[in-house]
């Protein structure tokens, strides 16, 4: 330590000796020092200015923070927060309850609510069809057109106690008046994988065109032949068998809905009727289908998307009923007998489809004698893009009754469908032309066709429809 001190003193003395003469020659500081001091003062002033700016900005930030802290919780924001908290708590409580009960809910093609053990399930679905129809025929009121909610349906379905016991309840708001009416209400029990029994109110297993949902038709509406010759809904019991290639249904019911020609020849309508109503002694309906190629699921509609496999389906149906014996005095038989049969074939190629059917109804009426009605429907469609499809349909029908002579039905329809999301969201349009007069046995207000007079001009119907199925 002593050596270092001595060394420092020697270095200091040497420096004094070196600079001493210069200080003696000029007592004023050198210009380089003045410049250095000036720059130091400028830097101090700049630093002070920047410090003042920082202090001003900090003051503004503090004022803004104070304003935000005082004003952010306004009445509106407080209400929004309370609602949000309430919704979150309610949702959490619901989820907690469902979890405690083992229940599940959500969306899988349809809205559903189910028990955790799988014993109970409820599905909710709906259909809305909004339509515009324009009609021309050669009568004093030549042109008619307008909008309507053609179908507004709500369906509840699922199973109870076991997946083997299924149910369906469906209602529709009428397009005229808007009243709500029951359409289907049935229970089905699966005895085995192949056999099941159904009882309640349902469509009779007769012709394929009527059995296909209105949401999954090819044209805007079913054919006029179908509107006159289908059996509609009834109340009864049905046994059914289904395997990989065969389906068979046999129904014993109150009666078929008499829509043949619109003349009410048989006069039965068993939809939503009491048990002791005078209708028929008995009514039996049966349908058999053979799946030659493809899968059953692809024949739930008439179309065939471009990625679908080839399918071929053959079908035949029959119906027989005899009216109620009234016991009233008569010189002859007073019960009508009604026999009907139909055959059909459906083919799908993945981007193209075709369907054809032939139907015959025979009514033995005590007043009018034998009545024979025949109908043919042929239709086909092809996809131009994965979502756009064009189609055409031809209809022929003849109504033979001894007391009157009617023109045969000849009808051609062409149109297209655009599938935004399959059948769930679909836009359809078509135009139909009556090649001959459309007379009473075949007119249909639902389909947009009126009764023609004695006219050489064809009746024309233009229809557009937007559909939502969920």
Model-based region annotation:
Residues 91, 266-267, 299, 445-451:
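Intrinsically disordered, low-complexity Ser/Thr- and acidic-rich flexible linkers and loops
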Residues 104, 108-258, 278-295, 302-313, ...:
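Outer membrane beta-barrel
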Residues 140, 186-188, 210, 307-470:
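Outer-membrane beta-barrel pore domains
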């Amino acid at each position: 330590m002593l050596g270092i001190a001595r060394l420092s003193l020697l270095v200091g003395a040497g420096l004094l000796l070196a600079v001493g003469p210069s200080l003696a020659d000029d007592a004023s500081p050198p210009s380089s020092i003045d410049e250095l001091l000036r720059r130091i003062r400028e830097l101090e002033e700049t630093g002070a200015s920047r410090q003042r700016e920082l202090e001003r900005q900090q003051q503004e930030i503090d004022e803004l923070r104070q304003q935000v802290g005082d004003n952010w919780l306004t009445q509106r924001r407080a209400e929004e927060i309370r609602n949000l908290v309430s919704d979150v708590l309610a949702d959490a409580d619901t989820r907690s309850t469902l979890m405690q009960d083992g229940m599940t809910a959500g969306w899988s093609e349809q809205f559903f609510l189910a028990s955790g053990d799988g014993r109970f399930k409820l599905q909710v679905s709906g259909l809305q069809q909004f339509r515009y129809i324009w009609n021309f025929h050669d009568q004093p009121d030549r042109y008619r057109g307008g909008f309507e909610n053609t179908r507004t349906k709500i369906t509840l379905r699922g199973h109870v106690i076991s997946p083997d016991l299924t149910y369906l309840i469906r209602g529709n708001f009428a397009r005229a008046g808007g009243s709500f009416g029951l359409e289907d209400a049935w229970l089905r029990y699966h005895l085995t994988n192949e056999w099941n029994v159904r009882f309640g109110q349902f469509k009779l297993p007769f012709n394929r065109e009527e059995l296909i949902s209105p949401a999954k038709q090819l044209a805007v509406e079913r054919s006029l032949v179908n509107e006159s010759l289908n059996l509609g809904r009834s109340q009864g019991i049905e046994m059914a068998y289904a395997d990989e290639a065969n389906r068979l249904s046999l129904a014993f019911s109150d009666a078929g809905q008499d829509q043949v020609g619109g003349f009410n020849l048989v006069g039965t309508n068993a939809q939503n009727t009491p048990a002791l109503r005078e209708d028929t002694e008995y009514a039996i309906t049966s349908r058999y289908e053979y799946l030659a190629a493809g899968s059953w699921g692809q024949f739930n509609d008439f179309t065939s998307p471009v990625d679908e496999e080839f399918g071929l389906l053959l079908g035949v149906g029959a119906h027989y009923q005899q009216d109620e014996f009234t016991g009233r005095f008569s010189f002859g038989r007073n019960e009508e007998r009604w026999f009907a049969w139909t055959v059909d074939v459906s083919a799908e190629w993945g981007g193209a489809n075709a369907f054809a059917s032939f139907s015959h109804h025979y009514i033995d009426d005590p007043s009018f004698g034998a009545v024979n009605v025949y109908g043919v429907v042929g239709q086909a469609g092809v996809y131009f893009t994965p979502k756009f499809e064009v189609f055409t349909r031809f209809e022929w029908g003849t109504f033979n009754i001894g007391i009157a002579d009617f023109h045969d039905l000849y009808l051609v329809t062409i149109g297209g469908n655009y599938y935004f999301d399959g059948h769930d969201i679909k836009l359809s349009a078509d135009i139909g032309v009556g090649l001959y007069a459309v007379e009473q046995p075949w007119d249909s207000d639902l389909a947009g066709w009126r009764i023609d007079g004695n006219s050489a001009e064809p009746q024309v119907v233009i229809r557009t429809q937007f559909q939502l199925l969920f």
